[in-house]
């Protein structure tokens, strides 16, 4: 039987009594974002809205985006990527489980030197596929041309952010390429593997701030 989204206590600044909020809203207050599903317009708009709010609240305090996604909509993924580049704070990306297709594109969009994969994470890249239309015959050519433009756009971003030459990116995008965390680091999609001793400890040990007593919430 599903248990729904867990709720945790949260004490608003200046309040004596805690209220129960869903765990993701609590974590958002700590600037921890989660992409744990297929990339679609709904989750993209949620993530973009949260990033814009946090950017307005403090445009210098780092955000952390945890990713476990099989990919999804190309346009929605590009929107999240662009929002990550737009906001003032660094966005650290952390891959847990799988970052495939647009999931890997968003992973790669984190702040350079702050893109991380956990030791057993998997990363996959391939060329974009899209469907704007409902199969109308007269629109097929139009869609094919748009997909080619998106493919070139995504390939250029991969080239710029991984350091790989264009021929390697286009070759690898022609098929599904799966990588381990270490292979993704060698490829340039991530900068650190979770067990790497150079990984910043603060990325992993922000949890005490979630459990702080009344004093921390009232500062």
Curated annotation (Swiss-Prot):
Compartments, as annotated in UniProt: Plastid, Chloroplast stroma
Instruction: Spell out the CDD domains in the cross-references.
Output: S14_ClpP_2
Q: Which residues are in coiled coils?
A: none
Enzyme Commission number: 3.4.21.92
Q: Where is the active site?
A: 101, 126
Role, per record? Cleaves peptides in various proteins in a process that requires ATP hydrolysis. Has a chymotrypsin-like activity. Plays a major role in the degradation of misfolded proteins.
Q: How does it assemble?
A: Component of the chloroplastic Clp protease core complex.
What's the name of the protein?
A: ATP-dependent Clp protease proteolytic subunit
